[in-house]
């Protein structure tokens, strides 16, 4: 494990339209002690050609292709297994970071002795245009808080691997990131929020996140099968999630 090296975990699948901008946002970081591990879940577009162009230019960028299409959870877990950094950050292959992201968040963690952190983020469209919507995280959140209403943007997370170790991402198609945060919060009491916008989250028209019926099913599986909650608690959390979604409709 290399001290103060940040391992950037990036699963990808058919993201050739966006992944070049994602990689560029990493290369431009003011904090330069990083490795970017891109694990490809058997893309059928031009993802491979784009990524290999950058691996040939920068040895810090590493590319691994799964033997068969297995889902984002398996790709994330593989990237985590391959990582050697003492810190781990997560970046989806269509999201972007401002150039001060790693430096600012590393300083925030060290100055406050935090092991698990996230940040605010903004939404952009498929052409990188701002949607003028900022998603704010909470100052700190525990396991029950994440169960009730997860305030964590996946591509904002950074955690201390030396303190917390590595984790296997629960193998569910959606909400596997939430399941990972819940695992970490069984070991670390809080995730601490940094009140700065340090990520741009891309809203895509064909995103799996847009199918609300499927999301209810994934939530149910997360609560019942992964977290072993009772039927009552699972129904309560799903109803609360639906309430939050409805309350945000203008």
Features from the language model and the residues they span:
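N-proximal low-complexity "stem/linker" segments adjacent to membrane-targeting elements
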Residues: 1-27
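Short loop->beta transition adjacent to catalytic acidic/histidine clusters or analogous donor-positioning motifs
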Residues: 3-6, 27-38, 46, 58-62
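Acidic helix N-cap motif at the loop->helix transition within catalytic regions
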Residues: 17-20, 45-53, 96, 100
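A conserved acidic beta->alpha catalytic loop
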Residues: 25, 32, 40-49, 68, ...
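Glycine-rich, basic loop-to-helix element that forms the pyrophosphate-binding segment
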Residues: 66-83, 104
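Conserved nucleotide-sugar donor-binding catalytic segment
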Residues: 81, 138-214, 218, 222
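Short aromatic/hydrophobic "clamp" motif used to bind/position activated sugar donors
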Residues: 88
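Conserved donor NDP-sugar-binding/catalytic core segment of glycosyltransferases
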Residues: 100-131
